[in-house]
From Swiss-Prot:
One of its GO terms (molecular function) is zinc ion binding. It is found in: Host nucleus; Host cytoplasm. It comes from Tomato leaf curl virus (strain Australia). This is Transcriptional activator protein. A zinc finger (unnamed) spans 37-54. One of its GO terms (cellular component) is host cell nucleus. A motif (Nuclear localization signal) lies at residues 17-32. Phosphorylated.
Amino acid sequence: MQNSSPSTSHYTQVPIKVQHKIAKKRSIRRKRIDLPCGCSYYLHINCHNHGFTHRGTHHCSSSDEWRVYLEGSKSPLFQDHKAPQAPVQLQPRHHSSPDTVQSQPEESIGDTQMLPGLHSFHSLTTSDLAFLEGI
């Protein structure tokens, strides 16, 4: 009997659930980066040219800083032996404070900023409650 499929190849597609299961088993390829302040973070091997600010210092992981590995053998293909560049210091902004800890407002009894004038939930109708639950 002749095959009804128009394709002459004998390739069968791997089901998506099997593909996901295989992808979950792969180890996460990431690089540990230690900051001068003593903190460290992990950067995914495929994530580059993105920066962030930590304790007032901007850090950027560019493609020049990467070591590329094959199959988990941990031997570098490419290494950049340049001296590390100093991180870029951000200029102080109008809303930044010299303190590293930001104080929180004290709790108080009274109207909230979100629902001013709301004294009791007992005064709400069922349609009001249904609306609030839908948010």
